[in-house]
Amino acid sequence: MESKIEILSTINVEHSDDLYKIVDTLNRTLKRDNLMFGLALDEENKNQAVFTIYRT
């Protein structure tokens, strides 16, 4: 069985510690709808975060 992850959207936002709480809540709430959310620090600008929405 092959698992394919599709990127639906990516956006750069100002980094905030609370962003991780939002991403965690979205992942817990929308997992059954085959959606996954990711958050990473921008490698070039540590004041920015990269927020990504995936379909699993």
UniProtKB/Swiss-Prot annotation:
What is the protein named?
Uncharacterized protein YpmA
- Please give the organism: Bacillus subtilis (strain 168)
